[in-house]
């Protein structure tokens, strides 16, 4: 329904909120028109972008898809870095050069294993924190290029560590390299998520964010395959080849960062409107009304700026923890906890963990490869799953099943049987498939779509920093739980993750709402009016806590309203009255 009112020779600006009792049809908040739920930012014809199928979306926005895929080497680098410590420590030659003999077998001491495993996460914390500032100050492309350069230097440090004569020096230099590489990976993956969330259309939002776990698993698979291929190489040359292979990702990422267009929302935020229009045109085909898209993004950002001016605040990290944005930040942080809570840290270290339950080194690396391949398959399926399924139920159901699988593994560890090690291996493969097609990509999507556009860079930086802290805690603690020279829990470690799954179910149930199909403007309105978590899906104007005064009109309720969530100041000045129309 379009509402145009001629009054004294000029057109009044109307905000139209269409309410429906159907929980699947959410109201649209637009300027001057009602489109039944469409988002003006991505609208070029009468089809609703939010309701397009995955294939239709790819056909309609092929360039957006191409640029999202082009940014993926940054995630590959992150995934490779995540798995490289666990796979290197499973190599006998690496254990010989960096470990010690315990009960006649070479092992990596729990202390060093813990700190090496934690090093990438520690680096992620600093890298993510810096990414938010670099992205806002110098742009998303510059942040990617800087991360690629730091990564290349870090790989060189890890490579050089093998040539020291003193084992403690070798361990220390390797630690420094992993810290630096973790910094680069944290900066890069945070930047990639910011970039893709800003250029993607609403119809592709779920599928695009599912690429993060999928490409993470791909990076892990590449790392595991490289190490597996190097197992038969004698001497240090085997693991040095594995380390050096990471340079390929750094070089590829640097080249791609030069080529891709800058994020239009970032350019608009820093006042480069003409550059934003050029970047937006590169993201879409000629028939797409990119100027309309840029105008809509500008409008949303301006409205957010006006809101914060009234609160007397500028864009700072502290703003993420104030007012309405506090709730949004908490949701982002909770979702960043999910990967460690369902067991990703242990699954990433499966090649070493499997050896503690009696599986031989060669088979343990093969197990890791199978697990990663299964997880990758699940992540590929999740690209479709997130385009059709609701996020919140998907997280709850897959977490519940995962808890049962961890419990079964823990129970098997209570019995001294040859079956235990194979049951443990099977349980881990089942868990990564279930989570890879459920809670993992769904939680990643929630971290990307929850924050406001204005604070997206800062909120993502805070989220990835907490992600790194949390992963670091698990990296340090887990070896003391399962390693043979400490806790020696083995398969009974499953009980630990059963408890974490139950804890996560509670967090999601109480805190994480269903945000599927909502535009940035709609999410702003939902959070601004403090809609309860479990009411997001069924929210409508009639059930909201907006209290406008009403004036009867033929066939509709008409009310004079205060400034709406997405109407810019310039539009409000064009009209002597602001009309809010609600169909009954």
Short names for language-model regions:
Residues 2-281, 305-584:
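Alpha-helical transmembrane bundle of multi-pass membrane proteins
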Residues 290-305:
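Short, well-structured alpha-helical segments
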Residues 286-288, 515:
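PAS/GAF/H-NOX family sensory domains and closely associated sensor/linker modules
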